Amino acid sequence: MTMRIDTDKQMNLLSDKNVAIIGGGPVGLTMAKLLQQNGIDVSVYERDNDREARIFGGTLDLHKGSGQEAMKKAGLLQTYYDLALPMGVNIADKKGNILSTKNVKPENRFDNPEINRNDLRAILLNSLENDTVIWDRKLVMLEPGKKKWTLTFENKPSETADLVILANGGMSKVRKFVTDTEVEETGTFNIQADIHQPEINCPGFFQLCNGNRLMASHQGNLLFANPNNNGALHFGISFKTPDEWKNQTQVDFQNRNSVVDFLLKEFSDWDERYKELIHTTLSFVGLATRIFPLEKPWKSKRPLPITMIGDAAHLMPPFAGQGVNSGLVDALILSDNLADGKFNSIEEAVKNYEQQMFMYGKEAQEESTQNEIEMFKPDFTFQQLLNV
């Protein structure tokens, strides 16, 4: 009898309704997979042209107890393990000396192995029903009707949905129905780039990595590198945003030479292998570090069911590896709430998810922010952060 009541409650909550997920990143796609497992009608609207679009960025590591739990629930954990690579860390100084190495012990190889972003997307896409993801959809307007949302896309037909889940990243432009909070810059800046065939194009630095990720710091300049990102070496350089950049970035990221000149000046007394990395790079991406603070409660009155997951909900500095993992926990909790029959309405299920998310999301943001503060102190070393 109890089973019958639970099933009826679930059907009353979800039957004859459709869900629109905005954004086809790992969090949005995982959300779609978890909903489909429960027979929910879901569509993902993604601005990329197609599944072959290359995703820029470093590898992702899914943590035990958070990101991996969502993959397990989706039935994809072993596939993730098959494609992910356990990687150690080399910590170097500005002269290119290896100060310490933290290797992955065999018993820890599944703790948080690194996976290429496109590989993770492929795992998730291959698990979804055909035509779940609708490509080349840039959302320009979200409007509530009497019973459904209307989604308006740039130069594409409009769609409707009973529930909208925003998973379209930290710079989402359609949060107004959920909160008036705005994204804030934290005061640090990141420059990222890829070098293909690094063993040929920057052999000195590639050998310094020796198959591991590499981290180096000096006087507030931080360098992170991963030599194994599907044939490319991905690296990032982080520093406090210069005062003269407060109103406008003084480096033209459309002009490679402008970026190279700036970085060579910043790294003038670093080893030639670091300069080799800069000289070899063909293009750079510059990004201010941002946070979407969870300080104010979200709106309790919304015209129709809508919520946010992933960076759209809790963008944070990338200095604790918590972003994607927190987002996958979002997907796990929200999908359970919507499908397990515990709640009498979508609004109740969403509210409970948001209450939980605010707790672990704030904690993750605080950890990331504290790491950011510590890492940009002049005397910071990666040994103290990694306990090696």
Swiss-Prot record:
Localization annotation: Cytoplasm
Binding site for FAD: D61, R117, D311
Main enzyme class: oxidoreductase
Catalysis: reaction(s): a tetracycline + NADPH + O2 + H(+) = an 11a-hydroxytetracycline + NADP(+) + H2O; tetracycline + NADPH + O2 + H(+) = 11a-hydroxytetracycline + NADP(+) + H2O; oxytetracycline + NADPH + O2 + H(+) = 11a-hydroxy-oxytetracycline + NADP(+) + H2O
InterPro entries listed in its UniProt record: FAD-bd, FAD/NAD-bd_sf, TetX_monooxygenase
Assembly: Monomer.
Function of the protein: An FAD-requiring monooxygenase active on some tetracycline antibiotic derivatives, which leads to their inactivation. Hydroxylates carbon 11a of tetracycline and some analogs.
Other facts: Activity is not seen in B.fragilis, an anaerobic bacterium. Activity is seen when expressed in aerobically growing E.coli.
Note on domains (UniProt): Consists of an N-terminal FAD-binding domain with a Rossman fold and a C-terminal substrate-binding domain.
Pfam family name, one: FAD_binding_3
Keyword presence, Flavoprotein: yes
Cofactor or coenzyme needed: FAD
GO process terms (BP): response to antibiotic
Family: Belongs to the aromatic-ring hydroxylase family. TetX subfamily.
Molecular functions per Gene Ontology: FAD binding; monooxygenase activity
Record's protein name: Flavin-dependent monooxygenase
Keywords, ordered alphabetically: Antibiotic resistance, Cytoplasm, FAD, Flavoprotein, Monooxygenase, NADP, Nucleotide-binding, Oxidoreductase, Transposable element
Residues annotated as binding NADPH: R54
PANTHER family, per the entry: FAD DEPENDENT OXIDOREDUCTASE DOMAIN-CONTAINING PROTEIN, MONOOXYGENASE ASQM-RELATED
EC annotation from Swiss-Prot or TrEMBL: 1.14.13.231
